Amino acid sequence: MKKIKVLWFTNTSSNYSVGNNEYNGGGWISSLEKELSRKLNIELGVSFFGQGQPNIINKNGVSYYPLTVDRSIKSKLKRFGSIRQQEKSQIDAILKVINQFNPDIIHVFGTEKIFGLITSFIRIPVVIHLQGLIIPYLNAYFPPSYSFVDLLLQDKSFLKSINSYIGFKKSAKREKEILQNCNFFMGRTDWDHRISKLYSPDSKYFYCGEMLRDEFYLSEPWENKTLGVVIQITSTISSPMYKGADLILKTAQILKTKTKLNFEWNVYGINEMNLAEKKTGILSKNVSVQIKGVISSSELCKALKKSHCYFHSSYIDNSPNSICEAQMIGMPVISTNVGGISSLIEHNKTGILLPSNDPFLAASYITQIVNNQDFAIELGKNARKSALKRHNKELIITDIIKAYTSINESNE
């Protein structure tokens, strides 16, 4: 059977640089690449924007095409103020790689970057793998009581925060163009499926689960009976306001003042909560919230196994791998019911769903899980069973190859 040549465009270098300890994002793409590259009927190329001089290599049967754009002062001055000029420079670099690899199918991971715009420049079929979606994320960018003014409160980083928000709005505008011009999508939640149909009604959607990092497949299941006396709650978030640092602080304060729980709330992925502390008037140190920064996947896996529950605080999300990883090791998960999360959690069966910005209900559910071991164990067992099926590597590879075959046949 003739090989299908597939060219990936990714936001990370995937397995191009082995040994990097990525924590937030990208790890599942590396896992998918490793498994897919073993299939004899697929020839895989991977392209991404990187720093320095590009070094095209072939490793473990995968061709890597790092992309660079002219970053000279002269070039920057020429492009200054012209987003379209910047995009043209990047599109030219992307088209050069496409001509070099000559793929049957192009697989773009995410709509956050420029890669999805290439549908207007080529006749090769392009499938976009939906990840986070900027347009609905922009709608939830400021949590209740937050506004653009709060960007000015972010100490020395306020200029960076303002630039980030402006860039986010520009990316949302570009994402609209990308979604409207794409005929094929891959996704994994009812939410991303519906949004793809809103913007491209005649498009074809393929369900495709995501692989997790290896540590979570290999981990021994979570056991409630081995946990310590001090209640451990774990969350992983990033810096945007919509990730819900304020909800963590408010929930922790309610646990402190309204319950007798002796707890520590460990928050990974960030180094400070300054803005959330200012907005809520709650200092993390006063409510037993400990900010742990970025850690490796193996360290996170160990931390989760020592925790009584995982809490996801975001105001918008599609299918956060942090939830999936916690479910995979079989621990109880509490999450806001936003975006695509209801496709991951069945309330009171594989986890707990609650309205965003409801710290009272959050505190109540945490208390229930801690005080009712049978309930916690049942949630964890059900979650693990669901996650093992959802993240089955062979099933994911089968689904993705079926999608590639269908797309390739539709183009013949």
PLM feature spans:
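Aromatic "clamp/platform" in nucleotide-sugar-dependent glycosyltransferases that forms part
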Residues: Y315
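Membrane-proximal helix-turn-helix segments that form the acceptor-binding/catalytic region
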Residues: L32, I134, D150-F185, L198
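Conserved acidic donor-binding segment of nucleotide-sugar-dependent glycosyltransferases
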Residues: H347-N348, I352-P359, Q368-Q373
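Glycosyltransferase donor-sugar binding loop
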Residues: T236, L249, F263-K278, G293
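Short hydrophobic beta-strand element within catalytic cores of glycosyltransferases
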Residues: P332-S335
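Conserved donor-binding/catalytic core segment of Leloir-type glycosyltransferases
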Residues: L7, N224-K243, L249-A252
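N-terminal subdomain of nucleotide-sugar transferases
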Residues: M1-N58, V62, Q253
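Nucleotide-activated donor-binding/catalytic signature segment of Leloir-type glycosyltransferases, i.e.
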Residues: E277-C301
